[in-house]
């Protein structure tokens, strides 16, 4: 912030605002953008100059209905006028209705706990798995992100592990399959994910003390660079877990609620996890999360005294928002729209790949897509700096995108517009990306 070069004629250059920001805000991640966001609507956020910025990350990969959706605004106003927060042992109608609605959408996952954030829901899921199995060892992917709290942070390997002391005992990791950069290859050069998975679990078995509790996974690793688990992988992973008495936890923070073209990403594979967590997309940008599990697992947890009280567990306000999100998803056929709009966006990105050598790979599903930037398409040399320049040039032109930089990969853009995005907005975004690439390459 303090080193930002701002246009002195812009309302975004508010000296008092930036002085207070520099003085009082904790710097919790990368540098803040050099704009002041005053409002948001649909697929756009608007800065202090009134400039429309096309949001291709749905806020923090969450606003599946776009910003300030009128149905959500109406629900918040209505619920605030009745009851928003309760003692954690009290129930309200929105909580029970949302739990029933979610259970109907995910047969086999009949029990639901409503919380606030993805990290919190993963904490609850891991805690439940440890209690039910009697184990304490948790396995995750090397490119994972499950949150920044305790057990969730211990299962997060894509960033944020250095300098914080020991993680939870029994934290193990395996590589995620990467079709663009395979570690194990079939004779035709394609990714041999089964051999990779077998090898990984051989190492897990060697490390384990016999106390394996769960594997926690994202169906598409977002912060890991949009790495999609190939068809068949989840079934093989579930089998590995069953053979060892482990539970399979799926973290569908970003893939859940229609974004991939299924209501939940695991449904493409026909593999039901033992526990599923939802967050980001469930509240469409408001703080709502859920832990879903089978009646059998929940009964075992209950009998063993499962305890997970939090301040905002089962709050009626976010639950009412969740019900409205599901209503809008069904009414506006947004799961199907994720397929059709996703195809249009992916076709646009593939066209850019044909035009620009710096685009090494386009991947993902529905409206959760990735674009990997490289400096050499043949060697796949990472293009971190070029990717950062592209992101900057896109922002200047009115497109907000997010890029992740990980060891062994190029800079990967995570592209996830709202499910309500229009064809025209998709085309505009792709056009701005093309202009940004040209400008970044000089």
How does the language model describe each region?
Residues 2-442:
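Conserved N-terminal phosphate-binding loop of PLP-dependent enzymes in the Aspartate aminotransferase
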